[in-house]
């Protein structure tokens, strides 16, 4: 019997396989109970081009230590878009890592789009 984590990882594997066929940069989101992380991977999937999270000192100061909120995800979305643009990345494929496109994941994606990242 498959538990909740295994089901999420199965969904993530399917998504990553489709993105690998497309040969585009990938914006990956990882969510925990206390933080949210975002990374932009290269087309081959082996190199991290940009990263942002609520665990970063600058973000923690801005959020007063509350890293598990939609507002925190919005800040991370803006930062990852800025860092990706600085690395020369304009378009990405969004990899939600099997998480539902709702709440913090959606807030991060919307903020990244507003900051100019195309996906």
From Swiss-Prot:
GO terms for cellular component: cytosolic large ribosomal subunit. One of its GO terms (biological process) is translation. Keywords: Ribonucleoprotein, Ribosomal protein, RNA-binding, rRNA-binding. InterPro entries: Ribosomal_uL18_bac-type, Ribosomal_uL18_bac/euk. GO terms for molecular function: 5S rRNA binding; structural constituent of ribosome. The keyword rRNA-binding applies. It holds the Pfam family Ribosomal_L18p. Transmembrane segments: none annotated. Belongs to the universal ribosomal protein uL18 family. PANTHER family: 39S RIBOSOMAL PROTEIN L18, MITOCHONDRIAL, LARGE RIBOSOMAL SUBUNIT PROTEIN UL18M. NCBIfam families: L18_bact. Part of the 50S ribosomal subunit; part of the 5S rRNA/L5/L18/L25 subcomplex. Contacts the 5S and 23S rRNAs. This is one of the proteins that bind and probably mediate the attachment of the 5S RNA into the large ribosomal subunit, where it forms part of the central protuberance. This is Large ribosomal subunit protein uL18. The gene is rplR.
